[in-house]
């Protein structure tokens, strides 16, 4: 792994659910692992086993039966800085096996995040990890780089937060950004709830991970929700079975599409918000009338929560219903969209024109953490 050029930039996309990390210029992240820190629930009794007081990522996932799992990033905002530091440490030293003090580092964050969040990120990077330079990029702008466009509206939906960001000729239009704190983790929680109605009980943080897996493997978005509900009620054609880790098999039917339907009808989980089709439409309507046509024709989807089968067709149908009747509407859902934020970051950090954008250690020492608002927008 040490074949990397001395100064290759690192790209670290810290999602609420997964950390995607790697080297600028690569076409995919080297390391993808869950953003979790696990701590033992029980007292260690066997001496000399080298038990640790905390586990990060995949190791926490594999030992989840005896751990309490916590996600330090909630709704795109870092809520536990000590755990976040552990995750970054794990990323640099264990996953990428690099010395952060030798590499400029590009981090990502959700749009409309509190300012203090990015200041603290900047401070930790320079003071704890001693990076030579860093930059904080807005997550939703990056998938556009990855799809080779300069104009479009990005719907980025991950585990913690969903947002629409319209971009015209490379400029994000901040007044039209829509943020919805409803994403993959809420869908997992909702699936836990509706599976309980079926008589399957999932309660612990470890069991939530099982439900997440069920969601990722079996859920899909219905083109017509009412029709699909009727089909599910009258036949068992939509039922699928899933084997739990202990060998017990459970069957799920209409839960498969009721779960992601929440994206279009947030009232399912008691949220008073508009669905993702309406936030997309509202975001476009907040933009200048002359550029709307270009946005309608370039709806770019990104993030793990846009990976449901059927979501692009449903989105096409819903936006067509909202938009003027003659409008050409195109939904772009690239197959690699799960990682397109990272891919966009990799492209951005390796552009020659980007090199003067880095915040250097020297600039940080002179201006302090608030420099991040001046240099990263």
Swiss-Prot record:
It is found in: Cytoplasm, Cytoskeleton. Disulfide bonds: none annotated. The modification N6-methyllysine is found at residue 86. It catalyses: ATP + H2O = ADP + phosphate + H(+). The modification Tele-methylhistidine is found at residue 75. GO terms for molecular function: ATP binding; hydrolase activity. The modification N-acetylaspartate is found at residue 3. Its EC number is 3.6.4.-. Belongs to the actin family. Polymerization of globular actin (G-actin) leads to a structural filament (F-actin) in the form of a two-stranded helix. Each actin can bind to 4 others. This is Actin, alpha skeletal muscle. It comes from Atractaspis microlepidota microlepidota. The gene is ACTA1.
